[in-house]
């Protein structure tokens, strides 16, 4: 019998407090998603079909994190989800939606409804700006067969030239009391658009995680051999791909990773793994971040069904030991129940954590809403559950093409308590991590990793750590018993 090591998870250990002059409100939570992509908070929403579609991804990016859109959908639908995130706000919209003057108001309504916008620039056949169609122009129009050119606000309009800053644009829009500012070149060709909505969101969400074009960042999951999906997602503007598998240390994953890095310019996160050897092999094949965790999730049964996995603390420690030598970020995926678990993962060297169950109960998640015994819940299932595998995740568990009645699940379907908005949940998690860093005297995540010291605790120590000897009469927003 070969026992490699004693393996621990979050509840087996505590961090020891240190002398500190650091206040929680003063710490920095900036971190990295991948080798090249920054995060303003170290939180990622999981690529699960009851956790992340465009609404969750938008909410996460606005708060400074990122969402990974799941792949249990056809390529076109996943691309649309990415596009919705990318078009939800921009500093400058470099590829604005436009319409021609000869089109009807009915055509314009289809465009504004589809993209959820309140107005659209009007151009001629050469791309020259000739007007703009706004809510005010169409508010009292009942004849949708009218031509756009007969109703629009015609030139001259207030415009700006390419290169204007957002601060200058804001001043110009305030001066002229307009909500949309077309960007044109010297020949009056439409090149972009700035909206007051985007400027307001910039003020409302100062920590938003954005790309170089001022668009919210978003990731997307892909499976083995899905190069066509990867190409379409990259064209749609995805910031990172997550090559997702229950066993990331497999030949097919390594081959797919090498193919993607050879043919596309995009950061690739790869997982899931738990060993030093796996981490080394993924980095050698081109991984820009390594995702860690086999079996720690609340809805995952891999460790029971297959007898395989590793407690999450030891898994993180294994992988960080290798990845840190190559300056490759590690993502701790699964097993997070409390904000203290997040702090422990970061102190072990993870650059960020991936959250599933805690976000599945939020308003923005795509899971079904339900009421059971008078309490509000949302559906939540593992990607290894029968329901998820029949929808498209069976390849993650090496069962692609298997009939539904022959699938061997490695996850369950259930429900989690409704937890309000994503922002409410992230606020509590961020607050807990800030508090932990204050106890540790760590001004940033790197200092937390460098300075943290741990003690292993007994079952009695764990019992003492939780609420005990009292009946809870009012639930706390960050403690679930």
Spell out what each predicted region is.
Residues 1-21, 161, 285, 307-332, ...:
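Alpha/beta catalytic cores of nucleotide-metabolism and tRNA/nucleoside-modifying enzymes
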Residues 23-39, 46-48, 77-115, 122-124, ...:
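Bateman/CBS regulatory modules and CBS-like beta-alpha motifs in cytosolic regions of diverse proteins
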Residues 25, 73-83, 141-145, 189-209, ...:
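Active-site-adjacent beta->alpha loops and helix N-cap segments on the catalytic face
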Residues 55-58, 228-236, 274-292, 332, ...:
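Catalytic cores of alpha/beta
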Residues 62-77, 186, 238-250, 288-306, ...:
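Glycine-rich phosphate-binding active-site loops on the catalytic face of alpha/beta enzymes
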Residues 69-74, 117, 121, 128-144, ...:
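Short beta->alpha transition motifs characteristic of CBS
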